[in-house]
Amino acid sequence: KETAAMKFQRQHMDSGSSLSSSSDYCNKMMKVRNMTQESCKPVNTFVHESLQDVQAVCFQENVTCKNGQQNCHQSRSNMHITDCRQTSGSKYPNCLYQTSNMNRHIIIACEGNPYVPVHFDASVEDST
């Protein structure tokens, strides 16, 4: 069975590529990572950093999650991410996405022992 930590890696980790070079990236990745099977997942973020670096965020600044839970953490540094958003005209099973590359701080929820990422909460721009 897929654990929450495994699901996080499937849905949000893409360490292999530093940035999604093609506009087709989200269309391909959302399909390959099984996020268009029963419906189109409307929004998803991929992180192009090493799993080690993303797991380390669990021990960085503690912030409140969007849902009010207290187990979210914000990355100290910017990370290369790709935001995938479903385009307005696309309908299941033909899920189409808009690909946006960004460099932002990520906010993830962590839990368990070992304490690992289980949910991608948000990304934020530098507050400077």
UniProtKB/Swiss-Prot annotation:
Family per similarity comment: Belongs to the pancreatic ribonuclease family.
Organism: Choloepus hoffmanni (Hoffmann's two-fingered sloth)
Tissue: Pancreas.
PROSITE patterns, sorted: RNASE_PANCREATIC (PS00127)
Designated name of the protein: Ribonuclease pancreatic
Reaction equations catalysed: an [RNA] containing cytidine + H2O = an [RNA]-3'-cytidine-3'-phosphate + a 5'-hydroxy-ribonucleotide-3'-[RNA]; an [RNA] containing uridine + H2O = an [RNA]-3'-uridine-3'-phosphate + a 5'-hydroxy-ribonucleotide-3'-[RNA]
Organism lineage: Eukaryota, Metazoa, Chordata, Craniata, Vertebrata
Superkingdom as given in the UniProt entry: Eukaryota
Molecular function GO labels: lyase activity; nucleic acid binding; ribonuclease A activity
Residues with attached carbohydrate: 34
Assembly and oligomerization: Monomer. Interacts with and forms tight 1:1 complexes with RNH1. Dimerization of two such complexes may occur. Interaction with RNH1 inhibits this protein.
